[in-house]
Amino acid sequence: GDDFRDIDVAFVSAGGSVSLEYAETITKHGAVMIDNSSAFRMYSDVPLVVPEVNAADALVRPRGIIANPNCTTIQMVSPIQRVHVATYQAASGAGARGMAELDDQIRAIGRGEEPEVKKFAYQLAYNLIPQIDVFADDDYTKEELKMYHETRKIMHSDLQVSATCVRVPVTRAHSEAIWVETTEPLELDAVREAFRKAPGIVLQDDPEDQVYPMPLFIAEKDPVYVGRLRRDLSSPKGITFWCVSDQIKKGAALNAVQIAEYLVAQGSLSKK
């Protein structure tokens, strides 16, 4: 039914149009709506939350809504000044139909047939597509602009962010190459230790033994995996690294559940 009177928290993951249509129904009796779509992310009165970074923002929610950031934004945020990122986003980012299309195309090519293109702009199998979502201002895609705006909102800062988002022929788990510039030079060992201690992050970084994160081994796991940590040769204040995360887990479901767990721990779900 449409009565959320006895519901404390509702996880909404049915797309932006559904979120906009049902938000008032869900929240009018005090239920907290944790929304996985992009519908409310940039509303000034809706907190955008990654629990490990800005959990307390979830406590102030005038509309009764908390937005879950875009999956690639969640993977990247950390207290920094300037970021360049190139994303390598799996077919699963386009949903079940995206994964099925990649699988169908690979099978068709294996049979010597012409692959069918429906969900993506071009054939994804054995290809890279440097476009995710439609093109917007300054020839950036909407996905790239989401990373820019959402990261700045989560960090409460004028952080400089530039992204290039690429769809890759991987079934599940997004990867990112990230270049970070800080205000002062950082010791690499200190950065490594910070990653090691950070909640929700697993450091997989041993180049001598070829240890680094790969989507093949990270699908269906919760943490963000970080490796290839090194100094940026182009900047004395720069660090560069590689990270991989299953965007269906930390990028959506897990982050939403962590927000709810934080609200419970803070006693923030009791209805007045």
Feature names for model-found ranges:
Residues 14, 71, 120, 139, ...:
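Catalytic cores of large soluble enzymes that bind and process phosphate-bearing ligands
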Residues 159-272:
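C-terminal active-site/capping subdomain that shapes the small-molecule cofactor and substrate pocket
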Residues 1-122, 160, 224-225, 229-234, ...:
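N-terminal Rossmann-like NAD(P) cofactor-binding subdomain of oxidoreductases
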Residues 47, 51, 69, 108-110, ...:
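Proline-rich low-complexity regions
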